[in-house]
Amino acid sequence: MEGQWGRWRLAAAAAASSSGDQIAAAWAVVRARAVAPVLQFAVWACMAMSVMLVLEVAYMSLVSLVAVKLLRRVPERRYKWEPITTGSGGVGGGDGEDEEAATGGREAAAFPMVLVQIPMYNEKEVYKLSIGAACALTWPPDRIIIQVLDDSTDPAIKDLVELECKDWARKEINIKYEIRDNRKGYKAGALKKGMEHIYTQQCDFVAIFDADFQPESDFLLKTIPFLVHNPKIGLVQTRWEFVNYDVCLMTRIQKMSLDYHFKVEQESGSSMHSFFGFNGTAGVWRVSAINEAGGWKDRTTVEDMDLAVRASLKGWQFLYVGDIRVKSELPSTFKAYRHQQHRWTCGAANLFRKMATEIAKNKGVSVWKKLHLLYSFFFVRRVVAPILTFLFYCVVIPLSVMVPEVSIPVWGMVYIPTAITIMNAIRNPGSIHLMPFWILFENVMAMHRMRAALTGLLETMNVNQWVVTEKVGDHVKDKLEVPLLEPLKPTDCVERIYIPELMVAFYLLVCASYDLVLGAKHYYLYIYLQAFAFIALGFGFAGTSTPCS
C-alpha cells in the first residue's frame, strides 16, 4: 500500500512539474513574442524623451549660468533702470527727503498710478499678512489703490477680511474691498472683475499678490522703473522666498524644485527669449499689455500662463528680476501639495492643447519663438517631463526585470538621470544632501503629474477642477496672541491613506523581489527604495498633519 502511495506521489509531482514547465514555456513564448516588443518600444520611446529632456535642462542651465554668472547680464544692465524722479529732482525710494517725495510729496504726480490686487478665498490664516504688506508699500498714497478681491464662501471669514480693510481705510490707505455674487472663473474671474471697476481705469500698472505673499515695502520702487523706462516690457516677475521651508522634509524638497525653477527656467527664459510663464503672483503687469492680450481668461486652471503666452504673441517682453524676493508660504500638507501640482500640470497641458494651433498660425512672431513655445516651453517641460519620469523610472525599468529579452541602455538609465541631478545640484549647492530624497519624492509625484498631464491633453471632465492650495500659516501661528484657527480636530486615519501610491508600491515590491530572487539585472536596490518612498507617502508620512483619531 505504501509503495502504491509513493508511486502516486511521484506521478503527481511529475505531472505538476510537467504542468509548471508547460506554463513557464508558454509564458516564455508570450513574453518573447508579445510583451518584450511592446516593452522594448516603450524603452526606446523613453530614451527619446530622455534625450529631449536632458538637452533642454542642459540648455537652460548653460544659459542661466553663462548669462548671469559669467556675462553678468543682470536686469539693470540689459534694461534701463532709474529711480523715479520728481519734477523738483526728488528721487522715489531714497531716504529722508527723497522718501518723503515717494510717499506723497508735492511731486507725487511723477509716479504712475498703480493697482495692487490681492485675490483670496477663505484665507483666514494669512489674510492679514498680505493686506498689511500691501498697505505698507512705499508709494504716494494718492497714486496707489489696494484692491482686495474676496471670493470667500465663509461669512465669518468675509467679515474678518472686510473689517481688516476698513481698519486700513481709517489709516487713510486707499483700499477697496470687492466681492462677487459667484466664483465664476475662480482666480481669473476675480482678477478680471477687479479690473472692470471704474477706478482702475486710471491705473497704468497692476501688481498681483496671492494671499500668503508679503512684499517688502520697496517692492514697487524696485520693479516699476523697469516698466516706466522700457515701454516694450509688459511684465516684471520677481522671485518667491519661502518662510516655512524648514517645517518638514517635504517643504525643503519643494524649495529645491522651486529654487531651480526660478534660477534656471525663469532666468534662462528672461535672458534668451524675454519670455517665461508668469507665476501668478509677485509680479507687476503693464495694464495695456493685459488688455492687448485679451485680458484674463478662465478656460484653464493656469490663467497666469495663459495670459503670459497671449501677451508674448502680441510682442510684449517679460523680465525676471531674481534679486527682488517676496515672502510666501509653501503647502506643508501632502494633500494640499498634490492638489497644487495637479492644477499646475493639468492646466499647462490643457493650455498646450488649446493654444498649439494658435501659436503655429501666428504671423506676428518668428519661427524661432514659435519653436521655443511649442517644443521647449510646452511639449518638453509640460508634457514629456511628467510622463517620462513616472513611465520610465516607475513602470518600464521595474517591469524589465521580468522580461530578460528587453535591454535598457546604460546611458539612458544611468548617465542621463545622473546628468540632470548634477545640473540641479549645481544650482542648489546647499541642498545636495537632500538629493536622494528629492529624486524618490519627485518620482512619486510624477505619478500625479503624469495623470494630470494626460487629463489636460485629453481634456477629460475634471480638466478645470480648481482646488485652492491650503494655507496653514506655519510661520505665524506661534506668534499670534489669539490663534487664527480653532484647534484642529484629529484626522481620520483613513483620510491619510492614498490607495494609488500603495498600489504602485505593491507593484514595485513584486518587481524588486522577483529581481532579487530570480532576476539577473540587479535593479532591486533602486526599486526597493522607490517602493518604500511610495509606501511612506501612501500612508501619509509626508508633510505636516494632525494625529490620527
From Swiss-Prot:
EC number annotated for this UniProt entry: 2.4.1.32
One GO CC term on file: Golgi membrane
Family matches, as Gene3D superfamilies: Spore Coat Polysaccharide Biosynthesis Protein SpsA, Chain A
Main location: Golgi
Membrane topology, as annotated: Multi-pass membrane protein
UniProt KW Transferase keyword: yes
Pfam families registered for this protein in UniProt: Glyco_trans_2_3 (PF13632)
Reactions listed under catalytic activity: GDP-mannose + (glucomannan)n = GDP + (glucomannan)n+1
Domain of life according to the entry: Eukaryota
Residues holding substrate: D210, D212
Active site: D151, D304
Alphabetized CDD domains for the sequence: CESA_CaSu_A2 (cd06437)
Enzyme class: transferase
InterPro entries: Glyco_trans_2-like (IPR001173), Nucleotide-diphossugar_trans (IPR029044)
Location of this chain's protein in the cell: Golgi apparatus membrane
Biological process, per Gene Ontology: cell wall organization
MF (Gene Ontology): glucomannan 4-beta-mannosyltransferase activity; mannan synthase activity
Segments traversing the membrane: 35-55, 383-403, 406-426, 497-517, 523-543
Keywords: Cell wall biogenesis/degradation, Glycosyltransferase, Golgi apparatus, Membrane, Transferase, Transmembrane, Transmembrane helix
Family membership noted in the UniProt record: Belongs to the glycosyltransferase 2 family. Plant cellulose synthase-like A subfamily.
Its biological purpose: Probable mannan synthase which consists of a 4-beta-mannosyltransferase activity on mannan using GDP-mannose. The beta-1,4-mannan product is the backbone for galactomannan synthesis by galactomannan galactosyltransferase. Galactomannan is a noncellulosic polysaccharides of plant cell wall.
Protein name, as recorded: Probable glucomannan 4-beta-mannosyltransferase 4
UniProt source species: Oryza sativa subsp. japonica
